[in-house]
Amino acid sequence: MFGIASSLFELGGLIVMHDADGCNSTYDTHDEPRWYDTPSMVYVSGINEIDTIQGNDQRLIDNIAEAVEAAHPRFVAIGGSPMPNAIGTDFKAIERLVAARTGLPTLGFRTDGIHSYLPGAGGAYVWLAKTFLKAPHRKPQKPAKRVNLLGLTPLDFSVVGNATTLKQIVTDAGFTLQSSWSMGDTLDTLAEAANADVNAVLS
């Protein structure tokens, strides 16, 4: 769940953590250092006991639709926590309902809030590529010149200058930075990532 939120944080989408709030509010206050200077739309759904017992997903869908009308995001992403995972919430069905109601590209991903953030971040990146990536309009260069940085989030690299340093290493070596997935870049720039000659995967 935190992986989805971190990888999509800067890209203009509405990101929903389907949870009762509680300890997962720490994403806002502790785990996401970009909150201090970068606006985003990351929310906790506030699922309650009755909704959990009855399997009521309608309130979540209604709240997302209301937030979309108010905030005008580029897309919607919904990730799960231990409670929805335990009751078998159908995130793909919610994805389809939200997409039909809002008309926006929507990701519903069954994260569980228990394991590593890597599957969530990776799944979000795959969805981004399938949904927004445009066909390349430049021919590959030999030797390679244009570089994508993949996997750049503060969960691994913090906000103490590491992202800037990595980008500087690329440009100082004579390469052109095509896109950064996903610190310091926009959704429109990421959509042009197929024009790169090589991907550098960061870990």
Which residues fall in each region the model found?
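An N-terminal assembly and electron-transfer interface module characteristic of large anaerobic redox
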Residues: 1-203
